[in-house]
Amino acid sequence: MTLNTQEKQKLINTHQNHGTDTGSAEVQVAMLSERISKLSNHLQKNIHDFSSRQGLLKMIGQRKRLLNYLRDKSNKRYTDIITKLKLRG
């Protein structure tokens, strides 16, 4: 359920704002979305893994807080990350 180094680097390169950006809200949302996706697949196979389910809910909450922060700071950055990651219909 964790991301390996190559996956992290690919996400950083795709969503960074400048050359040395590794911690912007966009990068964090992209990494959380990837981890959420992997954990969701795990939970579909392992229905009774309640501790992983709790971790999934925490990650979803963290992503929601980051997206709210982005929406408050810059609506353009918010809509860009939403469309890139296909989070909302």
Swiss-Prot record:
GO biological process, one term: translation
Assigned keywords, A-Z: Ribonucleoprotein, Ribosomal protein, RNA-binding, rRNA-binding
Annotated disulfide bonds: none
Start and end residues of each stretch annotated as Disordered: 1-23
Top-level taxonomic group: Bacteria
Pfam family, one: Ribosomal_S15
GO MF terms held by the record: rRNA binding; structural constituent of ribosome
Any single GO CC term annotated in Swiss-Prot or TrEMBL for this entry: cytosolic small ribosomal subunit
Biological function: One of the primary rRNA binding proteins, it binds directly to 16S rRNA where it helps nucleate assembly of the platform of the 30S subunit by binding and bridging several RNA helices of the 16S rRNA. Forms an intersubunit bridge (bridge B4) with the 23S rRNA of the 50S subunit in the ribosome.
Description of how the protein assembles with itself and partners: Part of the 30S ribosomal subunit. Forms a bridge to the 50S subunit in the 70S ribosome, contacting the 23S rRNA.
Family as reported in the entry's similarity comment: Belongs to the universal ribosomal protein uS15 family.
PANTHER family attached to this UniProt entry: RIBOSOMAL PROTEIN S15, BACTERIAL AND ORGANELLAR, SMALL RIBOSOMAL SUBUNIT PROTEIN US15M
Protein name (database record): Small ribosomal subunit protein uS15
Lineage, highest ranks first: Bacteria, Bacillati, Cyanobacteriota, Cyanophyceae, Synechococcales
